[in-house]
Design a protein with these regions (language model features):
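Cleavable N-terminal export/targeting peptides
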Residues: 1-30, 272-273
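Short glycine/proline- and aromatic-enriched beta-strand/turn motifs that initiate or cap beta-hairpins
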Residues: 19-74, 98
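Outer-membrane pore/translocation modules
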Residues: 26, 72-178, 186-211, 238, ...
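Transmembrane beta-barrel architecture of outer-membrane proteins
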Residues: 33, 55-57, 125-129, 157-161, ...
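Transmembrane beta-strand segments of outer-membrane beta-barrel domains in Gram-negative
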Residues: 35, 41-47, 113, 211-253
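Soluble periplasmic/extracytoplasmic beta-strand elements of cell-envelope proteins
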Residues: 35-39, 89-91, 262-266
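Structural signature of outer-membrane beta-barrel channels/translocons
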Residues: 63-65, 79-81, 133-137, 167-169, ...
Length: 273
């Protein structure tokens, strides 16, 4: 999971890494704040892999009031609309590349995969687009969020993500859970799951032309345990299934898995600037 810190998002799409933004804009401190931390994650070596790799991800976040935000997991964005019920604006992310030798996370500390050999490397990609978020229910406990992004560089596809998250407090502990789904265009699917004749000859897999459509769907959950007023430990996990266009690729059928599970633990400390 990719690196210009100013436009960063995890390659495998690890939304559970983020410490939940549980407070409405009216309760967010004015001015600049920063959060520093990290997370140890065990998950697929690459999207669709059945090999497990452990990675140590830095978690660096900068925000200005309830408007500007920048972090490795969530990218860089600006809330053009910001109220207790709605948030919306532009967003930019980066998707880390894929290395045919080992899977390619730049933060990998153990575990690797050699199942990509012969397919070639995929460069890092930038993704720019828009997001809309609606909070509702008692105490704004429910959050419905959607994003649409256009890729450039490593892939030139279009992605659309949607998630529904429920948050509740158990004493000082914040628990979040909910489903999510991702759609991708043919360009994206072909880049990561398609196999052209040259790749077929190099990797020993059948030629495959991937269609656009459902990329993945699944469930995620996180538990945030406050350590102090400005720091917390987060335990998180997710289980996802690849959609048919990805799962039907010979790469996944013969060398990967359509079920993708991730677990991790992180720590973050927030302070004003």
């Amino acid at each position: 999971m990719r690196l210009a810190l100013s436009v960063a998002v995890l390659a495998l799409g690890q939304p559970a890494l983020a410490l939940a933004q549980s407070r409405p804009p009216s309760e967010v401190p004015d001015g600049w704040t920063m959060q520093l931390g990290g997370a140890l994650i065990a998950g697929p070596a690459w999207q669709g892999s059945d090999d497990t790799a452990a990675s140590l991800f830095p978690d660096v976040r900068v925000s200005y009031g309830d408007r500007f935000f920048a972090s490795i997991p969530e990218g860089v964005g600006y809330n053009l609309v910001s109220s207790d019920a709605w948030r919306a604006g532009p967003i930019a992310k980066i998707r880390f590349g894929r290395d045919e030798e080992d899977g390619g996370s730049p933060f990998r500390i153990s575990g690797e995969s050699d199942e990509l050999r012969g397919l070639g490397d995929i460069d890092a990609a930038g993704e720019v687009g828009v997001f809309v978020e609606r909070r509702f229910g008692e105490g704004a406990a429910w959050r419905l969020r959607g994003e649409v992004r256009q890729g450039f560089g490593g892939h030139e596809g279009v992605l659309a993500d949607a998630s529904l998250t429920y948050q509740t407090r158990l004493g000082a502990t914040l628990v979040s859970m909910g489903p999510r789904v991702s759609l991708a265009s043919e360009d994206y699917m072909q880049t990561y799951f398609g196999i052209d004749p040259a790749q077929s000859a190099g990797a020993g897999l059948a030629v495959y032309s991937a269609d656009g459509g459902l990329l993945s769907y699944g469930l995620g959950a996180s538990v945030i345990l406050p350590v102090s007023r400005n720091s917390a430990v987060t335990v998180f996990g997710s289980v996802e299934r690849l959609g048919d266009a990805a799962a039907d690729s010979p790469l996944i059928r013969e060398r990967g898995s359509e079920t993708q599970a991730t677990i991790g633990i992180g720590y973050g400390f927030r302070f004003g600037l």
